[in-house]
Structure formats: structure tokens, C-alpha cells
């Protein structure tokens, strides 16, 4: 049996690598230097799919994806949400009191302020969380530590001194999963997500007209982001995620209005939602106050 391959941007042990292993257990993972290299690996047949980080609950959107995907000849075939659980790691034998410097990616460094302040560690920026773990293992010095994933510690033979050192417990990264071909989902498939890239004229009310159909047709929009194009400071390109299948009556009408009022529109993918979305909805529902009970009790 041929083992399938999924490509990701980063070093072995990066959170993208962890996302690949979680979403596609049993697949071979292929590390790539850049997002462009990751997409090229799939386009050239070196990998079956690509795991592409698109947004983080703390850091916001991941740049470049909106410019790379439309011209890559790939389809978004799925999504994955990966909890980011930072671990403080060092060589075996090192204790917390030995650590002087902490190495990690700048985004991760911005998520561990409490750790740095509590232990008065000196922060040192590196190109990658997993790359920082590789360096700490290579240097083999007790005073050096890295903040990265548990997988990075395992792959580099490092000892985890503290787990979950991130400031926010809800730190989660969302990924698009892209492939050369896609299985066409039936309009009756439950929990479908559609990703659309579109451009509007730089005129007053253009975006309002484009999006009006989604409101009137009751379509839930989960993501809308603007981008500058061609060196212009005018935001005319938008990336949008909406719930529903393009052939569903309501979404079909909304997309027809979008196409009528926009300069261009391109569906990047139609895929099933991650189970993470249902879990989040249940969690929010459970956390919502019961106004009836509160009123009676009050």
C-alpha cells in the first residue's frame, strides 16, 4: 500500500507538522521552507496534500495564503484546528534554575510573557519553534532552552521542563488542507464550508452590495478579510469563509449576487467543516447564561 504524503511549512516538530500528524495519521510528513514550497510540492506531485496555516486565535491571519492559493492550481479540501500548547524544553539534566535564555519564534515569544517575567529569562528570537528546539539540542548547554511543541521535544531528544507555558489557553491555529483534486461534495452533505476569493471595485458601497445577498439569504459568514492588491493601499480583494454548499438554494442566490456586483470571484474550496467548530458551538451554548432561569431565580 502506498503511503500518502502531506507537506507543511516549517521544520520537523513544528506545529504544522503536529497538525499534519493529527489530521492525517499514518501519512508521511514533508517539511518545506516556505508556503510556496509547500504548495509546489503538491502541485508537482511530491505530496498529496498541503497543510497551510491561515489564521491564529491570538496572532490573527497568516499572510501570503490569499496570494498563493488562487494561482496554485489547488483546491481547499478540508480544514483543521490545532491547539497550540507551548512547552519549555532543554537538554536532559538541565533544571529551571539553570536556564538563562529562551529561544523561539517571534509569534510564540509574544505568547509567553508570563513565563519570561516569572523566571527572568532572556528572550532570543529564532526563525522557527522547531528550529529553536534543534538549536538547543545541538548546543547541548544547560542554560539554553526552547519553547516549542511536545513533538519538537520528542524529535530532538529534549526534556520538557514546563508544559502549557502560553499566556492564553485558547491559543489555536486554523489550517486549510489543499490538494490538486477534490471529491465533489453532495449538496446534502452536512456541515459544509465554502471559501471564496473576490475583488470589488474601489467605489463607495461596492462591498455592501457584494455582501448584501448573504444577509438577505441567511448565510453565516465566519471569516472576511481584506487585502491590498498591486501595491495599492485600497483594499479591493477579500477572502471569505461561509457556511453552506454553493448549490444550496440560499447560498447559490448569495453567490449569484456576489458575482454580479464584484469584479471577479473564485471559489477556492468546498469542504466539510472541522468537528472543532461543533465543539466550540456546544461550548459556547453551554456557557451562555440561562436567562429564563436567571429571571426566575432573581
Regions from the PLM with identified roles:
Residues 1-298:
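Domain-level signature for soluble enzymes in the chorismate/prephenate branch of the shikimate pathway
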Amino acid at each position: 500500500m502506498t503511503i500518502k504524503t502531506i507537506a507543511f511549512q516549517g521544520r520537523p516538530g513544528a506545529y504544522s507538522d503536529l497538525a499534519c500528524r493529527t489530521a492525517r495519521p499514518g501519512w508521511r510528513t514533508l517539511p518545506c521552507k516556505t508556503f510556496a514550497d509547500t504548495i509546489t510540492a503538491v502541485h508537482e506531485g511530491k505530496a498529496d496534500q498541503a497543510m497551510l496555516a491561515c489564521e491564529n486565535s491570538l496572532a490573527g491571519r497568516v499572510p501570503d495564503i490569499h496570494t498563493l492559493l488562487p494561482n496554485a492550481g489547488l483546491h481547499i479540501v478540508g480544514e483543521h484546528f490545532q491547539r497550540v500548547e507551548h512547552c519549555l524544553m532543554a537538554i536532559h539534566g538541565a533544571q529551571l534554575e539553570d536556564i538563562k535564555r529562551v529561544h523561539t519564534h517571534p509569534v510564540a515569544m509574544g505568547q509567553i510573557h508570563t513565563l519570561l517575567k516569572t523566571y527572568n529569562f532572556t528572550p532570543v528570537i529564532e526563525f522557527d519553534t522547531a528550529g529553536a528546539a534543534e538549536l538547543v539540542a545541538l548546543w547541548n548547554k544547560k542554560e539554553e532552552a526552547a519553547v516549542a511543541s511536545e513533538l519538537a521535544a520528542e524529535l530532538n531528544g529534549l526534556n520538557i521542563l514546563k508544559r502549557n507555558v502560553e499566556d492564553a489557553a485558547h491559543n489555536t491555529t486554523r489550517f486549510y488542507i489543499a490538494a490538486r483534486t477534490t471529491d465533489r461534495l453532495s449538496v446534502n452533505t452536512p456541515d459544509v464550508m465554502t471559501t471564496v476569493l473576490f475583488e470589488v471595485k474601489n467605489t463607495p458601497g461596492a462591498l455592501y452590495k457584494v455582501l448584501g445577498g448573504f444577509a438577505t439569504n441567511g448565510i453565516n459568514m465566519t471569516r472576511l478579510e481584506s487585502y491590498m492588491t498591486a501595491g495599492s493601499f485600497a483594499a479591493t480583494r477579500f477572502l471569505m469563509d461561509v457556511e453552506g454548499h454553493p448549490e444550496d438554494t440560499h447560498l447559490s442566490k448569495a453567490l449569484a449576487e456576489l458575482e454580479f456586483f464584484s469584479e471577479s470571484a473564485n471559489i477556492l474550496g468546498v469542504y466539510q467543516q472541522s468537528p472543532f467548530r461543533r465543539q466550540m458551538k456546544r461550548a459556547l451554548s453551554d456557557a451562555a447564561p440561562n436567562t429564563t432561569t436567571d429571571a426566575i431565580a432573581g
